[in-house]
Amino acid sequence: MTTIIPSPMSEHPTVKALAGRTRAGAPEPLTLEAVRRLARLAGADDCGVVSLDHPDLTEEREPVLRAFPAAKTLVSVVVKMHPENVRSPARSVANQEFHHAGGKLDEVARALTGSLAELGHRALNPAMAFPMEMDAFPGRTWIVSHKRVAVAAQLGRMGLHRSVIHPRFGSFIVLATVMLDAEVVGRAEPLTFDPCVSCKLCVAACPVGAIEPDGGFRFSACLDHNYREFMTGFGDLLEDVVESRDKHELRERVSISESASMWQSLAYKPNYKAAHCIAVCPAGEEVLPQFLSDRPGFLREVFKPLVHRDEPVFVVPGSDAEAHVKQRFPNKTVRHVRSSLRSTSVEGFFRAMPLVFQRGPARGWKGTFHFDLDGHTATVRIADGTLEVLRGLEGTADVTISGEGQTWLDVVTGKRNAVLAVLKRKLRISGDRSLVTRFAKCFPR
């Protein structure tokens, strides 16, 4: 016969009180319409649900379950913005709209989480933007990709500008995700068309040429400029402060207005430097009529004020972005900065290469590079403006680079001299070394 020894906790008044209550049954199953109704009552403008097992969310599954192991369904929540605020050439107005809409969205997601809890369901709402898991920086700091979830939930399609375009509200939306511990009965009708109208205004408006007409996207160009006053730009500013000999050199590196702008972002939430691509987008049922009824007027009142705006544009020296702004926007002021993407591991270096690759310096030649750094291997092929990164060593290399991973990372970030690293046998480089110089120009720092 088993003797049950009472736990000290069993004598606690709260435990005793709960023991006397009738245990509640399982909560009622949730339907799509019920979730939508709760979301709208919380203040959402639209809402969709998608299973965490959806094939398009494979990359999201692990980080979502790490944050909320009970997650089974993701609820995508939409709050719309006021287009005229976002379009204003006074970018402080646009940034205030981003901040206000984002703040409202976090409140909506939190309220929805509370409503679901009242029905007996566990739910969690990560921030629509910040705070993030900065201990993981410069790796993945976000818990869930709100954009990816929204597309999988049939709330829109990804545009050329890499923002979700909602069929009704267009690009003027902010997104959040609520994680839910239950399956939801019912799914939204598939979105059968792309809300993008292929006007390419986002391509023409981007000051750094991050959006290419063929669908390509220069990630680093967007990050270096538009997100200048976020994590990486702030770090770059600190390095300028440390490296400057005196206040006069600091002023040569960082203007008074740039210092004030960074202070403003630190004090009143970070501000975007552009977001012109969203501002000029005419897509969406509620937005498109203005463009269709008066295209010249739309270009005159919305597009041209942003394109002709005198503003600093932050670019890495030798980058495609620098060449673009000098050729396309001579009225704008080029400001040189360090690359925002700096790898802290060999695997991170391999993953980041497609994000920082510059097509301009890669045109007109080709080469195959083998990397073997602390046992981490990769094959990199550059051919007339294109890049291919493969794990492992494949084919015949024109150049082989091997040795200590940290030494290579120090060379890439400018902390060490490559020649000295080779002389000290920290690195080994074999093959056509002239290609190494060409390789470096494709990844300016």
Regions found by a protein language model. Give the residues of each.
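Short secondary-structure junctions
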Residues: 41-46, 121, 360-362
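Non-catalytic, usually N-terminal nucleic-acid engagement modules in DNA/RNA processing proteins
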Residues: 2-106, 110
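Conserved hydrophobic/aromatic beta-strand scaffold that supports enzyme active sites
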Residues: 74-76, 175-177, 280, 370, ...
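Short glycine/proline-enriched loop/turn "hinge" motifs that connect secondary-structure elements
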Residues: 65-70, 165-172, 393
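Catalytic cores of enzyme domains
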Residues: 58, 94-95, 100-285, 293-301
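Feature captures hydrophobic
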Residues: 302-303, 308-445
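Short helix/loop capping segments that flank catalytic or ligand/cofactor-binding pockets
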Residues: 85-87, 174, 188-189, 290-291, ...
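Short, acidic Gly/Pro/Ser/Thr-rich loop/turn segments
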Residues: 82-84, 172, 185, 288, ...
